[in-house]
């Protein structure tokens, strides 16, 4: 896999766990796409964790030794609390109650951040996309299910689950 890593000093990995597909990306510090992997989302919490670790391993194995991997971000199609536990994910088989952040963080050597996929999409829009210079926005995600996030004064509004 040629990831176009010339002049890259830092990178991050993002993994989107959707109801039907799981997408892994590696981004440069400027937000440029360096690599992308896509797999069907497996049924079951153990299989989901194994897939996330496999994607992380493959993507992180592609970077040069002088490139600093800063973090792993995971977006989940469902309700996720502030500890990174999946509270309710109707389109992910047997994922409710999965402490995904805790399980993944114990296996990787970078900080792990887990959030609802719509919140992750909103963060991307605030930092790099259409909402970059806009204080307030509504982000709607469409996939196997439908989701949304509200941006107020440049910050993702957090509901009852954080």
Show which residues each predicted segment covers.
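Glycine-rich phosphate-binding loop and adjoining helix at the ATP-binding site
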Residues: 41-42, 46-53, 57, 67-72, ...
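Glycine-rich phosphate-binding loop of actin/hexokinase-like ATP-binding domains
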Residues: 132-162
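Short glycine-rich anion-binding loops that position phosphate/pyrophosphate groups of nucleotides
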Residues: 20, 77-79, 143-145
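Short glycine-rich, Thr/Ser-proximal phosphate-binding strand/loop in the N-terminal lobe
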Residues: 2-50, 54, 67, 85-87, ...
């Amino acid at each position: 896999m040629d990831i176009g890593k010339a002049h890259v000093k830092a990178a991050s990995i993002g993994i989107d766990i959707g109801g039907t597909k799981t997408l892994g990306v590696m981004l440069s510090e400027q937000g440029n796409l360096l690599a992308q992997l896509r797999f069907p989302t497996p049924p079951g919490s153990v299989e989901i964790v194994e897939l996330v670790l496999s994607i992380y391993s493959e993507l992180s194995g592609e970077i040069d030794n002088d490139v600093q991997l800063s973090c792993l971000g995971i977006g989940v199609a469902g309700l996720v609390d502030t500890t990174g536990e999946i509270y309710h994910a109707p389109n992910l088989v047997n994922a409710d109650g999965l402490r995904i952040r805790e399980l993944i963080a114990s296996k990787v050597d970078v900080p792990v951040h887990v959030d609802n996929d719509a919140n992750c999409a909103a963060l991307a829009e605030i930092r790099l996309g259409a909402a970059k210079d806009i204080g307030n926005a509504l982000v709607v995600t469409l996939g196997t299910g439908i989701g949304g996030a509200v941006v107020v004064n440049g910050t993702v509004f957090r509901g009852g689950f954080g």
